[in-house]
């Protein structure tokens, strides 16, 4: 699965890990995360993430 990087702080969303602290289960693709989810480190929205190169 594709990882996504926060362009503001560099946090990497890894679908294999998810974001359990914010109720995103492992195996959840970035596209399937709710639109109101924010970066757990800096708080920006999904629109500030880019696919990892």
From Swiss-Prot:
Task: Extract the InterPro entries matched here.
Answer: Rubredoxin, Rubredoxin-like_dom, Rubredoxin_dom, Rubredoxin_ET, Rubredoxin_Fe_BS
**Entry keyword set:** Electron transport, Iron, Metal-binding, Transport
How is the co-factor bound, per the entry? Binds 1 Fe(3+) ion per subunit.
Needs which cofactor? Fe(3+)
Domain named Rubredoxin-like: residues:
1-53
The signal peptide stretch is none
Q: Where does Fe cation bind?
A: 6, 9, 39, 42
GO biological process annotation, one example: alkane catabolic process
Pfam families the record matches: Rubredoxin (PF00301)
GO MF terms, alphabetically ordered: electron transfer activity; iron ion binding
Q: Which family does it belong to?
A: Belongs to the rubredoxin family.
Which function does this protein serve? Answer: Rubredoxin is a small nonheme, iron protein lacking acid-labile sulfide. Its single Fe, chelated to 4 Cys, functions as an electron acceptor and may also stabilize the conformation of the molecule.
PANTHER family membership: RUBREDOXIN, RUBREDOXIN-1-RELATED
Q: Which NCBIfam families match?
A: RubredRD (NF045768)
Q: Protein name, please?
A: Rubredoxin
Q: Which organism is it from?
A: Acetoanaerobium sticklandii (strain ATCC 12662 / DSM 519 / JCM 1433 / CCUG 9281 / NCIMB 10654 / HF)
| Source lineage | Bacteria, Bacillati, Bacillota, Clostridia, Peptostreptococcales
């Amino acid at each position: 699965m594709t990882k996504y990087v926060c362009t503001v702080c560099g946090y990497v969303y890894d679908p294999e890990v998810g974001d359990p602290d914010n109720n995103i289960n492992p195996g959840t693709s970035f596209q399937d995360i709710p639109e109101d989810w924010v970066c757990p480190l800096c708080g920006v929205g999904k629109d500030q993430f880019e696919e990892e190169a």
